[in-house]
Amino acid sequence: KQIMTLVLQLQTPRIGTYNLSCGPEGLFILDTNEKRIDLEILQLSFDSIVHRPQYEVVSEDINNNVTPDLKKTKFSNQYLLIPQNNFVTEDVKILEICKFLKPTCDLLSINFFSQGGPHIKFQSMKLEKDEYKINISQNGITIYANDYGGRFYAIITLIHLISYYDSKLPLGEIEDRPYFVWRGMHLDCSRQFHTVKHIKRLLIYMGMFKLNRFHWHLTDNEAWRLDLNCYPNLARQSSFRGYKQLIPPLYGSGFEKSGGYYSREEVKDIIAFAKKLNIEVMPEIDLPAHSWALTQVMPELYDHASNMHSEDVGSYKNNTINPSLESTWNFLNNIIAEISDLFSFHIIHVGVDERPKSS
């Protein structure tokens, strides 16, 4: 074996300094015949160890046992006993939610489908969107809400409380509704591809903390991940990267072909899954800049006769589509029409950020 030493210099981005490193992920070396040489990367050595900050422990009270904080609680020092965290759930609207959350509840050893234990009842009440009330007494638990979101968040609050108190709940009342209309989470699936399974896992975490907007970043310089009928080759050609692929290795992807895209059926599946968690899915199609992958497949979207050579903050050259071309507007009309039909949410995010000044 031949030992090769590589000295890596940490680059400092314009938005700040990274204090951690994953090392030379994706590194590969070719011989003069462009054949890949087998590598064994030994343990990295660093000049100094990064010390992570220690954070103060938050005091333990009821509002810190449910995240986000509940708006109003009134509990006594008495408890409703719940042997083995078993509940009897009979209301159809509550059962619908509990069935969907069963895999998560199984992991937490919470059973909403027992033949014995406190009964969970539901009563409709005129409340605000996503607002709910819970009454806990020795006779059982009653949930009050006006819509699906209120019922769903009431169950989520019970899951948090049961996980904390274990086999009992304090008697009393809860009144709660979200502090903000928009409670979002962003996931960049362009720079790194995430499977449908992983996205659903993130959505479950979002639902457990009452977030209601999934900002799905589907396109950027590095890939176009959304499969569209109007341009069937776009995602299939730009969503994979690797050596001698249309999109070169990026972000540690390495020599082999890797990546993926989301079919229309997968998108519909994710949207339906998110709705059961009271989450709306907002797609982001990043334009007019951040479009390097797009322009590799559809070079007619920028003007080849122009002598302008732009470069963005990520060192991508000519990554901006040209709004003065008829082909650009035809493209925009086609994709917006199809995306609007595919996604049920009323907003499409179009980026409009970091356009190179010379573009």
Positions of predicted regions on the chain:
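His/Glu-based metal-binding/catalytic segments typifying zinc-dependent metallopeptidases
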Residues: 335
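Short beta-strand segments enriched in hydrophobic/aromatic residues
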Residues: 10-12, 287, 354
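Feature activates predominantly on carbohydrate-active enzymes
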Residues: 137-329, 338-349
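Acidic, contiguous N-terminal accessory segments
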Residues: 21-178
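Intrinsically disordered, low-complexity Pro/Gly/Ser/Thr-rich segments with frequent PxxP/GP/PP motifs
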Residues: 1-16
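Beta-strand secondary-structure signal
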Residues: 7-9, 119, 142, 215
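N-terminal leader/propeptide and maturation segments of large enzyme subunits in energy/redox metabolism
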Residues: 353-359
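Switch/coupling sub-region of P-loop NTPases
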Residues: 332
